[in-house]
Amino acid sequence: MQIIWSKNAQITFEAVVVYLEDNFGVNIAKKFIAKTNSSIQVIASFPNLYKAISLKQNVRKATISKICSFYYDVNEDTIVILYFWDNRQEPIDF
């Protein structure tokens, strides 16, 4: 399946990377990027691997680390990465 990054996903991903670089160093940020890319490749092959959120069955939440997840929308031919989320925040409702 084709992976598409939404504008929000690009912005929130970059914000997480900058936060990690500033607070934990470049190596931690690089590990986060690698883990994210790996998760996205797995999702491309197995789009329904992660749990669907309650109200929208086509939107799923993939956990990258205990502090960060990303939400993605599974469509017929594409997967849209919607945004990255700091798990320390209150969950969002769709």
List PLM regions with ranges.
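Enriched for short, Lys/Arg-rich terminal
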Residues: 68-69, 73-94
